[in-house]
Every structure is written in C-alpha cells, then in structure tokens.
Amino acid sequence: VHLTGEEKAAVTALWGKVNVDEVGGETLGRLLVVYPWTQRFFDSFGDLSSPDAVMSNPKVKAHGKKVLNSFSEGLKNLDNLKGTFAKLSELHCDKLHVDPENFKLLGNVLVCVLAHHFGKEFTPQVQAAYQKVVAGVANALAHKYH
C-alpha cells in the first residue's frame, strides 16, 4: 500500500486510540448482520438468529478482536502486507473457502465503525487513508486466490 507520510501518520494516530475489543466485535458483528450470508462461515458461533444475538455473541466479539489484532499487525507492516497475511490468506482460501469479496466488505464495515466511533476526528482525509489500507489488506488476504 502506498501511503504518504501524512496518511501513515493519520492512520497510526487514530489506530492508537482504537479499542480493539470493542471495535473488533462491532465490526465483525455488523458484517454478519449487514451481510447475513457471511454467517455461514461461523456455524460454530452459536446464536446468530437476530441482530441483537449477533452483536451480543461472545464468540463474535472474541473473533472480532482477533481480526483487529491481525489488522494491527498489517498496520505495522504496510510495506509487506502480502507477507504479513500470507498464512491467513492460505487458511481462508484453502481450508475455510471464504469468498475473497468478504475481505472488502469487512474493510468497508471497519471504516464505517471507525467513522461512528471517532466522528469529526475521522475526517475525509483520514477515511481516504483508511480506505487505501483496508483495500491493501483485502488484496493481501485474497492473494492466495490468484
């Protein structure tokens, strides 16, 4: 991902304020509610029968935290996203058979959640930088599919 120094600084500064537990759970939960077909990958998570059930599900929250911790690793390695996500790409492609389009959806949901949490602080410039990052991460996660 090519980010200017200003964009990297904006992404890093905002990410330092992110509560990974809260934002991770909300991001994955929203993905599962807004795009319900993604629930098929989470059969073992128990009750996903309603938006409230999804958003309060402890397994959704725990996996959301895990997802955002991986995203944090990506932010530390923006110059090598494919390398950073190689094993996860392989897992999601070969074992889990996740449609790579879902990575783009998740990235866009993350941007929505960040905008919701940070309001005016999430300026159009910050959003533009994050859109580049989530697109780069989605591309890296889809790499094994190519």
Swiss-Prot record:
The modification N-acetylvaline is found at V1. Red blood cells. PROSITE patterns: GLOBIN (PS01033). Residues 2-146 form the Globin domain. The modification S-nitrosocysteine is found at C93. The modification N6-acetyllysine is found at K59, K82, K144. Signal peptide: none annotated. GO terms for biological process: hydrogen peroxide catabolic process. Heme b binds at H63, H92. The keyword ATP-binding does not apply. The modification Phosphoserine is found at S44. GO terms for cellular component: blood microparticle; haptoglobin-hemoglobin complex; hemoglobin complex. It comes from the Eukaryota. InterPro entries: Globin (IPR000971), Globin-like_sf (IPR009050), Globin/Proto (IPR012292), Hemoglobin_b (IPR002337), Hemoglobin_oxygen_transport (IPR050056). Pfam families: Globin (PF00042). The modification Phosphothreonine is found at T12. Involved in oxygen transport from the lung to the various peripheral tissues. Heterotetramer of two alpha chains and two beta chains. Belongs to the globin family. This is Hemoglobin subunit beta. It comes from Mustela putorius furo (European domestic ferret).
